[in-house]
Amino acid sequence: MQWDGSKNAGFTEGEPWLAVNPNYKTVNAAEAQDDPDSILNFYKKLIRLRKQYADIIKGSYTLLLPDDPQLFVYERQANGQKLMSISNVSKEEAAFYWPDGSEPERAELLLSNYDNDSGTESRITFRPYETRVYLLA
């Protein structure tokens, strides 16, 4: 584990039996902790969201667009609240169209791994590996 930018990436004061990756000064836990856009901090936000909407996480699960090769889209619903998770699982851009009957203008963007507008247009272009979670009214 690359803990920080110190000798041997902070892993050991002894001689490691495997070489430390040369990127240890910039790719390490200490740097990730300080970077609000790091994967570590994205997962922390995801965990907070899961705790905040615990009832929904235990609620019903509906897979949307099961045949789409690029987008993994599902809804979780409970107690009158609904979350929609949309993930582009490909290395190419992907177009998402809000389902008929949905009200994207009332959707609240709760989490994204990119800086985004709210995505309330009828069509959203997702960047490679982009994920968004919306609270639907």
Where would I find each of the regions flagged by the language model?
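Short beta-strand element of the conserved SAM-dependent methyltransferase core
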Residues: M1, Y74, D115, R132-L136
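Loop/helix patches that line or flank the sugar-binding groove of alpha-linked glycan CAZymes
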Residues: M1-L83, V89-A94
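A structural detector for beta-sheet-dominated domains
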Residues: D4, L64-P66, P99, S112, ...
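Short helix/strand-capping connector loops at secondary-structure junctions
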Residues: N23-K25, N113-N116
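Short, glycine- and charge-enriched coil/turn segments that flank and shape catalytic ligand pockets
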Residues: D34, G101-P104, S118-T120
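A conserved amphipathic helix/loop scaffold
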Residues: S87, N116-S118, Y129
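Beta-strand-rich binding/interaction modules
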Residues: E93-Y114
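C-terminal beta-strand-rich structural cap/linker in extracellular carbohydrate-active enzymes
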Residues: T120-A137
